[in-house]
Regions:
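ER/Golgi luminal nucleotide-sugar-dependent glycosyltransferases, focusing on the catalytic module
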Residues: 1-273
């Protein structure tokens, strides 16, 4: 099975991504497309796309998929898309191990299908406005088939720069009247309610940065909009469908978090000597 991988990078250098996949997917046939959204970085590697970073990973995914559709249309069976938070905030090895177990399932389906971690709606809005699902696929790492790719690109192209809100995302009256009110409140709360457990982890540092909040708000909207519409016209495939797997995932995420914290402490001690 041929697999194409589209990776959006912010903090990690493209060389790290190439090395990681070469090490961990050495028995898998794949082609890697890296979109670098770090606009401060000087890119000399001709195999790396310089991203626009207009919509974080969503603009990078769109740019990578457009290249894929244009130049490699018939050369792949499955697409893996991810951003580098998979490596900086998650347990990449454990996650991809489970994700790729479903690559044959997703590729085989004739309807639009995406696979990944399904997160539940757990505050304010409890169902997806487009599919009525009680969960959604988290966009940091997914696999998709060709029908899903085509629908994914269409969904992104159908969204205008002034939709679903204009000016400030945090003001309810700036939102389109076509969007479910509970979902609007869900997005706003995720961006500004800094004392809650469901707030965006970068909210406190960006609470007065309206431009940053607007971009993040649109990306949150797109995550649920894309997941809901693909589910409406196809299927979502959960890579952790049982409680046992959900528990394993939680444990391995905590292990990775502790490893990163320990490494940070060790690096600080070495650097301070």
């Amino acid at each position: 099975m041929n697999m194409y991988i589209v990776v959006c990078v912010y903090t990690l250098p493209p060389a790290y991504i190439k090395k990681w996949f070469k090490l961990h997917l050495n028995n898998t046939k794949y082609k890697l497309i890296i979109v670098d959204n770090n606009l401060r970085r000087q890119i000399t590697d001709p195999t790396v796309i310089i991203g626009t970073n207009t919509l974080n990973e969503f603009s990078a995914y769109n740019e990578g998929l457009q290249l894929l559709k244009k130049e490699f249309e018939d050369e792949y069976d499955i697409i893996l898309m991810l951003n580098d938070t998979l490596f900086t905030r998650h347990n990449a090895k454990f996650f991809l191990k489970h994700l790729l177990k479903y690559k044959n399932t997703v590729a085989r389906l004739s309807i639009p299908a995406i696979g990944g971690r399904i997160d539940p709606y757990n505050n304010i809005c409890y169902r997806n406005p487009w599919s009525n699902d009680i969960g959604y696929i988290s966009s940091f790492c997914i696999i998709m088939n060709k029908p899903a790719r085509d629908l994914y690109l269409k969904l992104l192209s159908d969204i205008s720069p002034t939709f679903p809100f204009v000016d400030s995302v945090t003001e309810l009256f700036n939102w389109s009247t076509h969007i479910d009110r509970r979902f609007k409140e869900f997005v706003i709360s995720h961006l500004i309610d800094t004392d809650t457990a469901t707030v965006w982890y970068q909210s406190k540092n960006n609470i007065k940065n309206i431009e940053r909040l607007n971009v993040k708000g649109k990306c949150v909207f797109l995550e649920h909009y894309v997941s809901g519409n693909i589910s409406k016209h196809g299927v979502l495939v959960s890579i952790f469908p049982t409680w046992k797997q959900k528990t394993q995932h939680f444990i391995y995420e905590q292990i990775a978090k502790m490893e990163r914290k320990l490494l940070s402490i060790l690096n600080f001690k070495v650097g301070s000597k």
